[in-house]
Amino acid sequence: AAAITLPAPTGPYNTTLATFKLTDKNRFDPYAPTKTPRALMISVFNPIPASQCSALLTPYMDPITAEYEDAVYAPLGIPAGTFGSLDLQTCKPNPRKAQAYPIVIFSPGSGNSRLGYSAMAQQVSSAGYTVITIDHPYDADIVTFPDHSTIIGIDVEEDTDFAVNVRAQDVSFVLNQLSQPSISE
């Protein structure tokens, strides 16, 4: 599919986008087949004044996730290659100390990837908020890590209370990580 650049957000700010893998070494992943620490992927959208923006096109989602989502949405008539062809208009991260903005945490609906909500998160960020989107492994349909390993979702709806508790622990962990300069700036 031909490259499609999504419209720039309409708020008073432009945005940067960074992704991070966070590993909770104090908690095992309750869904993993082996005893491994819980690892999450997050996206962080930060507002940046237009005067400090060095334009950058950023893929809407990584190629592995895009290919997976293409297959998921093919029965709905979405052409192959659609998700991989989408780009966001972002800015290169600014090495100067970032201004602190109010934080919005976004946890996607069960079975969905955080990446499907990137345009929405970017739009909110352009209004002057740091927006952090979280993938919940085994709950999201797919989570792809920087080393290209993936976790395909399972049906976590059998025990909704348990799934909600795991998500709450994920969000608490992410909030605790905000003190790390690489995430909050």
Task: Indicate residue ranges for each PLM-predicted region.
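Domain-level recognition of soluble alpha/beta enzyme cores
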Residues: 2-104
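Aromatic-acidic/polar surface patches that form glycan- and anion
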Residues: 33, 113, 164-167
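Short, low-complexity, polar/charged sequence segments that are solvent-exposed and flexible
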Residues: 38-39, 62-65, 123-126, 151-153
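Short substrate-entry loop that stabilizes the transition state in hydrolases
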Residues: 84-144
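Alpha/beta-hydrolase active-site loop
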Residues: 138-185
